[in-house]
UniProtKB/Swiss-Prot annotation:
Signal peptide: 1-19
Keyword Signal included in the entry's annotation: yes
Protein name listed in UniProt: Adipokinetic prohormone
Main location, first listed in the record: secreted
InterPro entries for the chain: Adipokinetic_hormone_CS, AKH/RPCH_hormone
Annotated source species: Manduca sexta (Tobacco hawkmoth)
Alphabetized PROSITE patterns for the sequence: AKH
Modified residues (Pyrrolidone carboxylic acid): Q20
Keyword annotations from UniProtKB, A to Z: Amidation, Cleavage on pair of basic residues, Flight, Hormone, Neuropeptide, Pyrrolidone carboxylic acid, Secreted, Signal
Function: This hormone, released from cells in the corpora cardiaca, causes release of diglycerides from the fat body and stimulation of muscles to use these diglycerides as an energy source during energy-demanding processes.
Length: 65
């Protein structure tokens, strides 16, 4: 009887632990956007675009010579 009680308690513990791991919302899966922080920096994008444009113009000038 004692072994059966311990076994049933162990099984209950395993089921509860599995449920807690399976339904933990803090990790795994896709997370909903909680903060609407923009990761886009328009000034940096404009600076990169301008640098690429300048290098392209310089490359074209070198090809003409």
């Amino acid at each position: 009887m004692y072994k059966l009680t311990v076994f049933l308690m162990f099984i209950a513990f395993v089921i509860i632990a599995e449920a807690q791991l399976t339904f933990t919302s803090s990790w795994g899966g896709k997370r909903a956007m909680t903060n609407s922080i923009s990761c886009r920096n328009d000034e940096a994008i404009a600076a990169i675009y301008k640098a690429i444009q300048n290098e392209a113009e310089r490359f074209i000038m070198c090809q003409k010579n």
